[in-house]
Design a protein with these regions (language model features):
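Positively charged n-region of N-terminal signal peptides that target proteins for export
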Residues: 1-4
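Surface-exposed strand-loop-strand hairpins of Gram-negative outer-membrane beta-barrel proteins
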Residues: 41-51
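Outer-membrane beta-barrel proteins
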Residues: 38-40, 202
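Bacterial N-terminal signal peptides
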Residues: 7-15
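N-terminal helix-cap/turn-to-beta initiation motif at the start of protein domains
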Residues: 17-30, 183-185
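Short, hydrophobic/proline-enriched secondary-structure or compact coil segments at domain edges
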Residues: 26-38, 61-78, 188-193
């Protein structure tokens, strides 16, 4: 009987060894996403291009399930060439009001896995089926909306080419992404992004900017990555901009 009791105790111990404990991730986080691609830009040809999207995420937790509410701050675009400069205005970012996303935590012997469900966001248009409906190609299409409120169709992006050709492009976009990674600690999550995007230029103030940018994701999966870091709830987007290099140090 004594041996049986000892055996049961040992079994109970070994069955629990290696199982990581689900942490409490409730709070305010910053989410930084890097989207690298190979793009074909006007007058510049094929170049490595990347967009870094920076936003706050308010996380609520129910056991292993997270509800994530995003608040976009800014997007930094590296066009991969000094010949082209793309600027995403503050009004563009302020107009984005994403719906809540969900993520699931899973305890494994390697640690806590983080898996956020596939998320679809359409910008500058309202589609019956955001996932499969084709994007509008005409600025007078009734599905097109002036989402950033500047009196122009779709969303406005500023572009400069060669320092002399500059203007605004009015676009619609569809972005899909899924995050998968690991909880590094109670204040840090890292992982990779699976994503696709579509963009249509509806119109532009300069005819040279009316061509749609052609691009494809960078073939290196490790280059598509994200970082989540817990921050003070009192932080603003300006605080985040000022401390971005500090947050990214060593990543």
């Amino acid at each position: 009987m004594k041996r049986a009791t000892v055996a049961l105790l040992l079994l109970a111990v070994f069955c629990c060894v290696g199982a990581a404990e689900i942490p409490d991730l409730t709070g305010t986080w910053v989410l930084i996403q890097v989207y690298p691609q190979i793009a074909v830009l006007p007058l510049a040809g094929e170049v490595p291009r990347s967009s870094t999207v920076v936003q706050f995420v308010d996380v609520a937790q129910d056991g292993e399930t997270l509800t994530m509410r995003d608040r976009y701050c800014f997007t930094l675009v590296d066009d991969g060439t000094p010949l082209v400069k793309t600027d995403i205005p503050e009004a563009f970012m302020a107009a984005l009001v994403p719906t809540p996303r969900t993520a699931v935590l899973r305890a494994t012997e390697e640690g806590i896995a983080f898996d956020a469900a596939n998320y679809v966001e359409v910008r500058g248009a309202v589609l019956d089926d955001p996932l499969t409906d084709p994007l509008p190609i005409d600025p007078v299409d009734p599905r097109v909306i002036d989402q950033d409120g500047d009196g122009q169709p779709g969303m406005t992006v500023r572009v400069t080419v060669l320092g002399i050709v500059e203007g605004e492009t009015y676009i619609v976009q569809r972005v899909q992404y899924r995050l998968a990674g690991w909880v590094i600690g109670p204040d840090r999550i890292e992982g990779r992004i699976e994503w696709t995007d579509e963009q249509v230029v509806l119109a532009a103030t300069n005819p040279l900017l009316e061509a749609d940018t052609i691009g494809r994701p960078d073939p290196d999966p490790a280059a598509h990555r994200f970082l989540m870091v817990r921050v003070n709830p009192a932080w603003t987007c300006e605080t985040l901009r000022e401390r971005l290099s500090e947050i990214l140090k060593g990543w």
